[in-house]
A protein has these predicted regions:
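Transmembrane helical elements of multi-pass membrane transporters/channels
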Residues: 9-28, 131, 165, 194-198, ...
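Small-residue-rich hydrophobic transmembrane alpha-helices
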Residues: 40-100, 139-158, 264-330, 361-385
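Short alpha-helical transmembrane segments in multi-pass integral membrane proteins
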Residues: 1-14, 68-135, 179-236, 292-358, ...
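Short runs within selected transmembrane alpha-helices of multi-pass transporters and secretion channels
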Residues: 61, 131-150, 158-166, 187-202, ...
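Hydrophobic transmembrane alpha-helices of multi-pass small-molecule transporters
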Residues: 52-55, 169-173, 199-203, 276-279, ...
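N-terminal transmembrane alpha-helices
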Residues: 2-30, 34-35, 51-63, 67, ...
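Helix-terminus/linker motif at the lipid-water interface of multi-pass membrane proteins
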Residues: 23-41, 110-119, 175-184, 243-276, ...
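Interfacial/gating helices of multi-pass transporter permease domains
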Residues: 32-51, 119-124, 184-185, 227-234, ...
Length: 441
């Protein structure tokens, strides 16, 4: 169904977009390192919560994109456009429902998740959460718009917007953090501004009728329960999977937060780099959902299998390259970030251990899941990922920390166990072909 040129046009912009999106969070973390460990700790802690919430929006966008892709694959363009409208309605409503309590109850929320942290870390965290929470509706709408353009095979546009957003974010950080000396609040303001502009741009461009998916009028959107239900059948299990995954990270983060600012700062840097190393591969996974979704909609099941295998192999190669580059330059990265000596030493040591294992097991533990979800096999993915994460990451980490008094290394031992077990389960599910037996539209 796809030529090599079509795949290149879809995947290369997606890879760049994901890398650029990751840079937005990374820039905040790196730039606040210059104002102390309390600042980097605050950004790291709150971003753990932010990622949890943003992944809920991403799950909704995924549900809508899969529905749209299968409708387009079966040549039902009108229904695909209607699904897009319902996606926009859904993410707007859900984002507002989440934003309001996160702002009003941010202190008890942070205390509940992270427990007792140093006062200056908590003060910075409260400011950072208040401002970044205001951006939730805008990142939700941007995700919905970006997903629709990817489904229309126009992944270059979201990449271009992401590039502009990152430039704006960097300039904003320079102005707010260093010129106005606003600290973590400056980093948050820059992120908020860039997300508002990104959402407005993509929603404006989404009104152009020349593309496969478009919205003729936002004011005319009314809820349609049947279409929303189809989106939620994909979005809710995916959201639970993503949400539980990030919630598990928060539980682990709360354990790390009691180890002091040196461990928190080192863990934050390694976690940021680990996430960054797989962003291009995640871009391939997002492209896989579009490709496999259209194949399944057209009932081309062998093509769906073929693209899942070939794109997983490509993502594996890309992940290895990124990991190798980061391992090679980790000392320079920590120096450039201005990390304190003890935090930098710990971060370098952890990175070399973690990335050697990540090269082997990360890709097969994640990429096949994109193909499964595109075919509608979301419950299996949700159950597998949730159980593996809680048993391996959370239980193993807490056990190692409290029994053997390990530091941040315990987190990565648990994560490595999760990657390994998940890899074998997903590969077995893929070979069984049961993932192709679901009906979505």
């Amino acid at each position: 169904m796809y030529t090599k040129e079509q795949l290149r046009r879809l995947l290369i912009p997606l890879m760049f977009e994901q890398v650029l999106t990751a840079l937005m969070g990374s820039v905040d973390t790196i730039m606040v390192t210059n104002i102390g460990s309390a600042a980097i700790s605050a950004v790291s802690l709150v971003d753990s919560l932010n990622i949890l919430i943003i992944n809920i929006f991403a799950a909704m966008a995924t549900g809508g994109a899969i529905i749209c892709a299968q409708y387009l694959g079966s040549n039902q363009k009108d229904k695909a456009n209607q699904a897009l409208k319902q996606l926009i309605f859904s993410v707007t409503l859900i984002s507002l429902i989440i934003t309001i309590p996160c702002i009003l109850f941010r202190r008890p929320l942070l205390s509940l998740i992270f427990g007792s942290v140093e006062k200056n870390v908590m003060d910075n965290s409260l400011n950072y959460l208040f401002i970044t929470a205001l951006s939730y509706p805008f990142i939700a709408l941007y995700n919905a718009g970006a997903a629709s353009f990817r489904t229309s095979q126009n992944s270059r546009l979201p990449m271009t917007i992401a590039f502009g957003s990152n430039i704006l974010n960097i300039l904003g950080n320079i102005f707010f953090i260093f010129t106005l000396s606003l600290g973590v609040a400056g980093a948050a303001l820059s992120t908020l501004l860039s997300r508002i502009i990104s959402a407005l741009v993509i929603l404006t461009l989404l009104k152009q009728p020349k593309q496969d998916l478009y919205v003729d009028s936002y004011l005319s959107i009314r809820p349609e329960i049947e279409t929303i239900t189809k989106i939620l059948k994909i979005g809710i299990p995916t959201g639970i999977e993503n949400g539980m995954f990030q919630f598990g990270k928060l539980v682990i983060q709360s354990t790390i937060s009691t180890m002091g600012t040196t461990a928190i700062a080192a863990q934050a840097m390694v976690a940021m780099l680990e996430s960054f190393a797989c962003q291009a591969s995640i871009g391939i996974g997002l492209g896989m959902m579009t490709v496999v979704g259209k194949c399944v909609g057209a009932k081309e099941y062998e093509q769906a299998r073929h693209y899942t295998i070939s794109l997983t192999r490509l993502a594996w190669m890309v992940c290895i390259i990124f990991c190798a580059i980061i391992m090679l330059f980790i000392q320079q990265i920590t120096s450039l970030a201005g990390m304190e000596a003890e935090s930098a030493k710990l971060a370098i040591w952890l990175t070399r251990i973690v990335f050697a294992y990540k090269m082997i097991f990360w890709t097969p533990s994640f990429l096949p899941g994109y193909g499964l979800r595109a075919a509608g096999d979301v419950k299996f993915s949700m159950i597998t990922s949730t159980l593996s994460m809680w048993i391996c990451r959370v239980v193993v980490t807490i056990f190692l920390v409290h029994t053997f008094h390990m530091g941040p290394l315990a987190v990565w031992i648990g994560m490595g166990a999760d990657w390994t077990i998940r890899s074998f389960i997903f590969l077995a599910r893929f070979k069984s072909n049961k993932w192709l037996e679901h009906k979505v539209i």
